[in-house]
Amino acid sequence: MKLTKTALCTALFATFTFSANAQTYPDLPVGIKGGTGALIGDTVYVGLGSGGDKFYTLDLKDPSAQWKEIATFPGGERNQPVAAAVDGKLYVFGGLQKNEKGELQLVNDAYRYNPSDNTWMKLPTRSPRGLVGSSGASHGDKVYILGGSNLSIFNGFFQDNVAAGEDQAKKDEIAAAYFDQRPEDYFFTTELLSYEPSTNKWRNEGRIPFSGRAGAAFTIQGNDLVVVNGEIKPGLRTAETHQGKFTAKGVQWKNLPDLPAPKGKSQDGLAGALSGYSNGHYLVTGGANFPGSIKQYKEGKLHAHKGLSKAWHNEVYTLNNGKWRIVGELPMNIGYGFSVSYNNKVLLIGGETDGGKALTSVKAISYDGKKLTIE
């Protein structure tokens, strides 16, 4: 018996369907939030973050396939690393991990995984910028990385916190000084970086004509790059969106309209949103923010999210003819998972939901220009 629920949402001017009859994917063995992943052929790789030092694979073309654990990642447990696939191999960069003193620190190392023999190799290179909050995607023979926190500033904050020991007053003083700054004073990465595995070289692909971001949704499809929102300083997101295009003269950028606000709500931008393409339509969903933070920032409060609660979201947006609109909602709030475009669907793998609870679920969303389907 086919169990489908269809709702015509007049406020959204879209039909969306929850389908229990389409292909379903197995849950992850463990909840993975703040991790990373990539697609190689028909196989998706997901790991790290709350998954520890583990990576798992799933053959998407096999309806009966289950997740399989691959060789343990040799770089140790870490959150918010960047990953991408080039020439059939998986590359993992950076992240945030504890050192021997117990300090959370940005790391800028790089590793390669070869599926043919299930082995990892540490690469003789280091990223030229901090890679926490960075977003990565591959194009041709390169990995492109956008945004990220400043290594020295971020590491210094955690070093100072550990040095404060049990002195809560000192910790409060450190936090107040850290959050009470303008966005530009955090020195988020404002260059588009690339890494070319064949030459083991990093390249500055040009300065982005917008503020540095952390946790932005970043997607490359063909020669087009799309950047949606992200943090512009700790606790403060932006609703701005941008589009780039690879040309003979480098990446040419233009601004897109801001992401619209859901009905009856403010739009405080999103960090940790998930994105991809379905039937040629760009989709972005989920993410988290602090409702009211943009208002407080405009009122002159640099610690923009002070006193506010973090919120996770479920709206699904699409970009059509240069305009954004909301076409439906997920059955749950989600953020900081891994998303990948596959077979005209966008897979939403893991992530976290309200309160930061790690998810094991694998959802698929698709959109044909009229109807959003959620599996």
Curated annotation (Swiss-Prot):
Q: Which residues form the active site?
A: 231
- Which InterPro entries has this protein been placed in? Kelch-typ_b-propeller, NANM, NanM_proteobact
Q: Where does the signal peptide begin and end?
A: 1-22
Give the reactions, separated by semicolons, that this protein catalyses: N-acetyl-alpha-neuraminate = N-acetyl-beta-neuraminate
Q: What is the lineage of its organism?
A: Bacteria, Pseudomonadati, Pseudomonadota, Gammaproteobacteria, Pasteurellales
Protein role: Converts alpha-N-acetylneuranimic acid (Neu5Ac) to the beta-anomer, accelerating the equilibrium between the alpha- and beta-anomers. Probably facilitates sialidase-negative bacteria to compete successfully for limited amounts of extracellular Neu5Ac, which is likely taken up in the beta-anomer. In addition, the rapid removal of sialic acid from solution might be advantageous to the bacterium to damp down host responses.
Q: What is its main location?
A: periplasm
Question: Where, per UniProt, does this protein localize?
Answer: Periplasm
Q: Which GO terms describe its molecular function?
A: racemase and epimerase activity, acting on carbohydrates and derivatives
Q: What Gene3D superfamilies does the record point to?
A: Kelch-type beta propeller
Give UniProt keywords alphabetically.
Carbohydrate metabolism, Isomerase, Kelch repeat, Periplasm, Repeat, Signal
Instruction: State what protein this is by name.
Output: N-acetylneuraminate epimerase
- What Enzyme Commission number(s) apply to this enzyme? 5.1.3.24
